[in-house]
A protein has these predicted regions:
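Long, terminal "pre-/pro-" and other extracytoplasmic accessory regions
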Residues: 2-13, 17-168
Length: 168
């Protein structure tokens, strides 16, 4: 038995994983750099999205190399992803959520919010108040041990941290 094919497969996997990590690091660097110039906060983006339904999650992200503010909203039994201009506050695009992975996430987030007693915005405000100098990058609700929580990602300079905030 020749060990070369096995070594080649291992090296190929390492190369692919390294490329993925580098891409993620590049996106994170772009996110950090771009967030500094965003005039809108995540909380303001959630408030603006309320005109289109109940905000169920939100995030600043880099997708396909482009920095954007995305908010998932629920309106009755329909879910949409809104793209908010992070400088003007205008909703620039609204897309129905139909892909199974995104749709499953939206349903899970919406279900978690049925147990919530405070809004996502209020949860973000609490997380930010408890972390001086940090800014909210994303908020995602979930159920943990039967209780509604919000996972809030915060950023200060290049330091990112995740804060779990009760929604009850």
């Amino acid at each position: 038995m020749k060990p070369r094919p096995i070594i080649f497969v291992i090296m190929l996997n390492v190369t692919i994983c390294s490329a993925h990590v580098a891409l993620s690091a590049s996106n994170q660097h772009t996110l950090i750099r771009s967030l500094v110039s965003a005039k809108l906060s995540l909380q303001q983006g959630l408030t603006l999205a309320q005109r289109h339904g109940q905000p169920i999650s939100g995030k600043f992200e880099v997708e396909d190399g482009k920095f954007q503010l995305s908010v998932y909203v629920a309106n009755k039994e329909q879910f949409s992803e809104l793209f908010v201009d992070y400088n003007t506050g205008k909703i620039v695009k609204s897309e129905p959520i139909t892909q199974s992975g995104d749709l499953d996430a939206a349903k899970t987030q919406s279900a978690a919010l049925t147990k919530a007693k405070i809004t996502l915005r209020a949860a973000i405000d609490k997380a930010v108040r408890g972390s001086w100098g940090f800014r909210a990058v994303s908020v995602t609700p979930a159920l943990k041990d039967g209780h509604a929580i919000a996972s809030v990602v915060l950023l200060k300079g290049e330091e990112m941290k995740n804060v779990e905030q009760s929604l009850e």
